[in-house]
């Protein structure tokens, strides 16, 4: 079960170029609907993105399918078990309304404050709960075996553990989150170069010579 969650997490990272903290703080509501197109997209807010670099993030259909399967099966399973244990009872300090996009926070003595979810930091997002007919559950996309949000430090540990297993098995493999982002950059550059070469091939020899001189 958790191998499939981890695989979906890694595939999403290497195919989108998201940083570890950015991806670890995603909410279920960030996951776009599966469409008939090759890519779907979601908006990464400046409060989450490093250096405030808000942007559209494009997710390949195959990766989105795996993430959606995790949400519908593995994630839902741990949420049900956590509810049955009463883990979420009373967790109403910060409740996120997915329809309005606002978070209602209890700031003391019953006083409520409302803010847009897009203004929250990664740490604040991991504290959010959502309420449905079935009850409360974390708003976070990535949940642990106990049904609680997976911290950034835990993801780093998972990479370290995977690298240690590779060493123990004699496999010459090593990976970390930043390497996946570099891989995304290299693959994207290669695709751009292929597209550029394909466009050049459509030009007449005279046009190509003018392009070279420029």
Give the ranges of each region predicted by the language model.
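Alpha-helix-centered segments that form part of catalytic cores
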Residues: 1-7, 119-143
């Amino acid at each position: 079960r958790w191998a499939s969650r981890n695989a979906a997490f890694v595939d999403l990272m290497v195919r989108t170029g998201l940083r570890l903290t950015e991806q670890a703080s995603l909410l279920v509501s960030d996951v776009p609907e599966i469409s008939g197109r090759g890519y779907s997209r979601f908006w990464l807010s400046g409060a989450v993105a490093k250096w405030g670099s808000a942007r559209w993030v494009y997710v390949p259909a195959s990766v989105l399918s795996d993430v959606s399967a995790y949400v519908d099966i593995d994630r839902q399973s741990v949420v049900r078990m956590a509810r049955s244990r009463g883990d979420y009872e009373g967790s109403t300090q910060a409740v996120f309304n997915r329809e309005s996009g606002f978070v209602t926070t209890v700031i003391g003595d019953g006083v409520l404050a409302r803010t847009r979810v897009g203004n929250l930091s990664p740490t604040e997002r991991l504290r959010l709960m959502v309420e449905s007919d079935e009850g409360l559950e974390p708003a976070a996309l990535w949940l642990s075996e106990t049904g609680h949000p997976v911290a950034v430090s835990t993801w780093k540990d998972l990479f370290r553990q995977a690298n240690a297993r590779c060493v123990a098995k004699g496999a010459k493999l090593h990976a970390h989150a930043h390497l996946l982002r570099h891989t995304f950059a290299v693959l994207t550059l290669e695709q751009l170069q292929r597209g550029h070469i394909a466009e050049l091939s459509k030009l007449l020899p005279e046009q190509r010579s003018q392009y070279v001189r420029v």
